Amino acid sequence: MIIDTTEIETINSFSKLESLKEVYGIIWMLVPILTLVLGITIGVLVIVWLEREISAGIQQRIGPEYAGPLGILQALADGTKLLFKENLIPSTGDPRLFSIGPSIAVISIFLSYSVIPFGDHLVLADLSIGVFLWIAISSVAPVGLLMSGYGSNNKYSFLGGLRAAAQSISYEIPLALCVLSISLLSNSSSTVDIVEAQSKYGFLGWNLWRQPIGFIVFLISSLAECERLPFDLPEAEEELVAGYQTEYSGIKFGLFYIASYLNLLVSSLFVTVLYLGGWNLSIPYIFVPELFGINKRGKVFGTLIGIFITLAKTYLFLFIPIATRWTLPRLRMDQLLNLGWKFLLPISLGNLLLTTSSQLLSL
C-alpha cells in the first residue's frame, strides 16, 4: 500500500488552519468583553476622583492633589495599597461564605453592563429583555452582602447584611415598575429600542418629560439600591462600624469598595439610557456625523461622539448622588422601609396605571 505524503500534509495543514480559526474566534469574542472591563475600570477611577473633588468643593477644602496631576491617580494609589494588605479571615466565621460574598456582589454588577448601549450598535448583548435582565441581575448582589454578613460571624456585619437585603427588596419593586412603564411607553424592553424611541424629537422626546413621576421614583430607588446617603443604613458608621464590611481587609474590602462605585455608575448609565436619550445628541433633525461635516465613511468618529455623549450625560447626572451625600441626613430604618413600601410603591403603581391607560387610549 502506497501512502501519498502530500495528501497527509494537506490534511494536517487543513486541521491546523481550522484550529487557528477557532483560536482567533475565541480571541475575537474576548476582545469586546476585555475592552468593556477596561472601560468600566477607568470609569470607576474617574468617578472616585470626581466624588473627592466635588466633595472637597462642597466642604470648601482642597481635595487630593499629590497622587498624579490634580490627584487623578489617588484612587489607583488606594487600590494598590489595598492589594498589598493582609487578607484576614475571622476564626469563628464561615471562610467559604466570607470569601464568596464580595465576588458575588462584584460579578453580578459587572454583568449588568452587558446590556448597556454606549453608542449606536455598540452594546455587548442587545437582548429583547435587556432592562429586566438588569433588574434580575441586580437582585443577586444583596445575596452576596447577606452571605458576607453571615459568614463574618459578627453581630454588626450580620445586621448590616440583613439591612442590605431588606433595603434591596423594598426598593427593587418600585424600580422594576418604573422600568416597566418605560417599556410600555417604548413598546420594547430592549435598551437599544428604548434609546431609539427617544430620538425622534430631540431632547423633547426624552422619557424624562413623558415620565416625570417615574423619573423621580427611579432616582430615589436607584440611590437606595446603591446604598448612597441618605440610604446607607447597611454600613452606617455610627451604628454598625462598617456594616457587612466590618471584618474585611485587603483586596476583599477593595471589592466592596469597587462594587459600590460600579453600582453607582451602572445606575447613572441606565438613567441616561431610559430617561435622557442615551447616545443621541438630542438636537432635533441633526445627525452627529453631519453636524461635524463628515460623511457616512466617518462611522468611527460618529461612534466616538455617541460614546462621549452617553458618558457626558452620565457623569453630569452623577453630581446628584454625590451632592446628596453631603446634603441630606441619614434616614432611620423604619423611615427607609416606610418610604419604599408606603410611598414609592403606590406612586410607581399609579404611574404604571397612567402609562398603561395612555397607551390603550392611543391605540
Curated annotation (Swiss-Prot):
It catalyses: a plastoquinone + NADH + (n+1) H(+)(in) = a plastoquinol + NAD(+) + n H(+)(out); a plastoquinone + NADPH + (n+1) H(+)(in) = a plastoquinol + NADP(+) + n H(+)(out). Its EC number is 7.1.1.-. The chain crosses the membrane at residues 30-50, 98-118, 127-147, 165-185, 248-268, 269-289, 300-320, 336-356. GO terms for molecular function: NADH dehydrogenase activity; oxidoreductase activity, acting on NAD(P)H, quinone or similar compound as acceptor; quinone binding. InterPro entries: NADH_UbQ_OxRdtase_su1/FPO (IPR001694), NADH_UbQ_OxRdtase_su1_CS (IPR018086). Pfam families: NADHdh (PF00146). NCBIfam families: PRK06076.1-2. NDH shuttles electrons from NAD(P)H:plastoquinone, via FMN and iron-sulfur (Fe-S) centers, to quinones in the photosynthetic chain and possibly in a chloroplast respiratory chain. The immediate electron acceptor for the enzyme in this species is believed to be plastoquinone. Couples the redox reaction to proton translocation, and thus conserves the redox energy in a proton gradient. Belongs to the complex I subunit 1 family. This is NAD(P)H-quinone oxidoreductase subunit 1, chloroplastic. It comes from Atropa belladonna. The gene is ndhA.
